[in-house]
Amino acid sequence: MKRPVTGKDLMIVNMGPHHPSMHGVLRLIVTLDGEDVVDCEPILGYLHRGMEKIAENRAIIQYLPYVTRWDYLATMFTEAITVNGPEQLGNIQVPKRASYIRVIMLELSRIASHLLWLGPFMADIGAQTPFFYIFREREFVYDLFEAATGMRMMHNFFRIGGIAADLPYGWIDKCLDFCDYFLTEVVEYQKLITRNPIFLERVEGVGIIGGEEAINWGLSGPMLRASGIPWDLRKIDRYESYDEFEWEIQWQKQGDSLARYLVRLSEMTESIKIIQQALEGLPGGPYENLESRGFDRKRNPEWNDFEYRFISKKPSPTFELSKQELYVRVEAPKGELGIFLIGDQSGFPWRWKIRPPGFINLQILPELVKRMKLADIMTILGSIDIIMGEVDR
């Protein structure tokens, strides 16, 4: 590290791992010249639990409850990636009803994750008021999750070939009501936050990342889309049934903290659009127990159609992963969440490599905070959106 020409003594400051703005057990060793950041070194690993090694000693159905502990604020995505890999290896078809319900759950999870990013991000830069409004909306999402899965967080809802249970009676109407209500709340956030001159002063031009730089660092998700690159795996990979809905990729050109905020805010409205279309076009309609209707062959033969069944033929707990390699990925709220899976003709995966978006997005932090003020570290770190459970695994 070069000594600045000012000749002043440098000060080394420890931020974290118990700092309230650290969003988990992240530690930063920051070298300061007065208020200016000269160098920053992130120290990781405080929350490492060996998730990749645990996967090698568990069948997929046993491993599902573990994966919700990676990104514990967007657990549906970790579940989706865990079942998508074996489904592709085993060529297992998912009924359209299950696929639609998965999309609804994924997008609700995206909204919950973005809300839980927005509240603390605003608190980090000195705006406490929106925090309480934002958490009120997040509670509504968790109420919907609790009604459908039995758990507010750590849902354990996805299964190989479908989902664990059908939607309960009245859930679809509740979810549609939430969608209508939430759209008005997003407008309120924009009035309260987006045009606030103090907020703009803190985020505009702070932590700028160019498009080419974002690609070179391997960034993904809102970090990449805020730098002028409209890349979204839901459009590119067309997994689940995303290509059956009308929605737009949200992106910005500026590449600063404000652009990342705007991308996430507009992504929430796009998620609502997708949820509304999925609820209205749900195969089988708003009935609550299609599986039992399927047994009633004489009276209702149409319920036996594959697309109406909410779950396909269940694979056995000793479902074997064929001997091949596979990389699967989904567009999680924080970026590209991927799994490199190697099967070995046994019930356990031979290798289970996790590609966490937060870990890779965090690598650019030292580059962004250099030559910035100490107070800007919290703004930049908050705009990256990390969860340490996913970073350390």
From Swiss-Prot:
Coiled coil: none annotated. Transmembrane segments: none annotated. It is a peripheral membrane protein. It is an enzyme of class 7 (translocase). Keywords: Chloroplast, Membrane, NAD, NADP, Plastid, Plastoquinone, Quinone, Thylakoid, Translocase, Transport. It is found in: Plastid, Chloroplast thylakoid membrane. GO terms for cellular component: chloroplast; chloroplast stroma; chloroplast thylakoid; chloroplast thylakoid membrane. GO terms for biological process: photosynthesis, light reaction. Its EC number is 7.1.1.-. GO terms for molecular function: NAD binding; NADPH dehydrogenase activity; oxidoreductase activity, acting on NAD(P)H, quinone or similar compound as acceptor; quinone binding. It catalyses: a plastoquinone + NADH + (n+1) H(+)(in) = a plastoquinol + NAD(+) + n H(+)(out); a plastoquinone + NADPH + (n+1) H(+)(in) = a plastoquinol + NADP(+) + n H(+)(out). It comes from the Eukaryota. Belongs to the complex I 49 kDa subunit family. NDH is composed of at least 16 different subunits, 5 of which are encoded in the nucleus. Interacts with the chaperonin CNP60B4 subunit. NDH shuttles electrons from NAD(P)H:plastoquinone, via FMN and iron-sulfur (Fe-S) centers, to quinones in the photosynthetic chain and possibly in a chloroplast respiratory chain. The immediate electron acceptor for the enzyme in this species is believed to be plastoquinone. Couples the redox reaction to proton translocation, and thus conserves the redox energy in a proton gradient. HAMAP family: NDH1_NuoD. PANTHER family: NADH DEHYDROGENASE [UBIQUINONE] IRON-SULFUR PROTEIN 2, MITOCHONDRIAL, NADH-UBIQUINONE OXIDOREDUCTASE 49 KDA SUBUNIT. Folded specifically by a chaperonin Cpn60 complex containing at least 1 Cpn60 beta 4 subunit. This is NAD(P)H-quinone oxidoreductase subunit H, chloroplastic. The gene is ndhH.
